[in-house]
Regions:
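Extended beta-strand/beta-hairpin segments
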Residues: 1-31, 75-91
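Amphipathic, hydrophobic secondary-structure cores in small proteins
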Residues: 15-62
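Long, leucine- and charge-enriched amphipathic alpha-helices
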Residues: 49, 53-91
Length: 91
């Protein structure tokens, strides 16, 4: 960690090296980079004709779709929990 409170590290995503920095732990940054790398490789393996830019955009769209689905599921579960908490009598 540097004096500015950020962790810095170099990661490999789809064969390219990137220098990343952030306040998250080094392990978290590596996990995120690995997730992006895995997604790009998954898309690339499905269609070998796509260039890197298209693979990156399709990966971003897939990741955003997954994020929005999970966020919607989270909000639905939170609503259920809140409704159950309201219905539960206070002792």
């Amino acid at each position: 960690m540097q004096g500015d409170g950020k962790n810095r590290l170099t990661v490999d995503i789809f064969g390219q090296q990137y220098r990343l920095s952030g306040k998250a732990s080094v392990n978290h940054i590596r996990m995120v980079a690995g997730f992006v790398d895995d997604k790009m490789n998954e898309i690339s393996n499905g269609n070998h004709r796509l260039d890197t830019a298209k693979i990156a955009v399709l990966s971003a769209v897939n990741i955003a779709d997954e994020y929005f689905r999970l966020r919607q599921e989270y909000e639905e579960l939170l609503k259920i929990i809140q409704e159950e908490a309201k219905a539960k009598p206070i002792d």
